[in-house]
């Protein structure tokens, strides 16, 4: 078994294979020099000086005990589906019987003039957080481009580090795909009460500077000073290798419920996979799909059950949880129940279709998070939720 990628999906696939097949050879290849680690931790702990060991999913010993061979810090440059071989940048060829394609995704950096300057960083790898930590002593002003979960987490970390922080969101509201307008507004108020300035519905004209970034110029001509610009504009699946090898690609590598691709003996999972037209690129989905791909590669009859897309955010001295469909389909008629406490900055909103729960937003008090995740799966009735 050869696994391409050392993220959540690749790691979960390796573990699932070993549970079923104790003797087959398992090789895992990553282009980062570190053991597979918990990527969502990066923005949550920009300032925590984390070591590789602290965010690793397993210790080096675990891979040795499980007899999983790691090839770290190497790029895969080719995939030959006829010969069933993987080619590495140093010319090494590895034969596979079953291949798991889990190459994840990269940050999308919009083509804004000036984006290639020093001081413009997308937080995607451990190396990026190290870079930010090294720059910080010289940084007073930070601009974060993107008002999603990761952007706001990064903004809060920078604020705690003593910088003045501005968040720019191109959409008319924060987290518009997951939150309704009132919740987006509440999140903006909370952020601003913590001293983070938020601009929604903006256009970015250019990143100013002379090789080192010095500011961000908006479409209306306003200029914001910045020695550090963090980009958090979503991700794009890594599909180049799969495409060159002739696998079916849409926005990501197309898979069925067993995570099989269009080519026999090749499975894909995680951020780089797309199932039933959907690619959420979220951590729980990568873990789940990895397990299924690993099981299927061993000939097991596992099937992927869609993970409900949920979003949780901790920071700004508040917490947020949103899951399901929060009134996003203009052709449907939703019933809603809303509870608001502006003083304590608490907000709860429940969305129902045909009297059954389809979406939840909690801000401030998220103690019902586990209960609501269950209720969404069970399509709970209105009466059961709104007591």
Give the role of each language-model region.
Residues 6, 19, 272-369:
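Mid-to-C-terminal Rossmann-like scaffold of FAD/NAD(P)H-dependent oxidoreductases
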Residues 4, 94-106, 145, 224-234, ...:
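Short hydrophobic core segments
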Residues 103-161:
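Glycine-rich dinucleotide-binding loop and its adjacent helix/turn
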Residues 23-25, 64-66, 70-90, 94, ...:
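A Rossmann-like FAD-binding core segment of flavoenzymes
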Residues 1-69, 157-178:
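Beta1-alpha1 glycine-rich phosphate/pyrophosphate-binding loop at the start
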Residues 216, 220, 224-248, 321-387:
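C-terminal catalytic lobe of FAD-dependent flavoproteins
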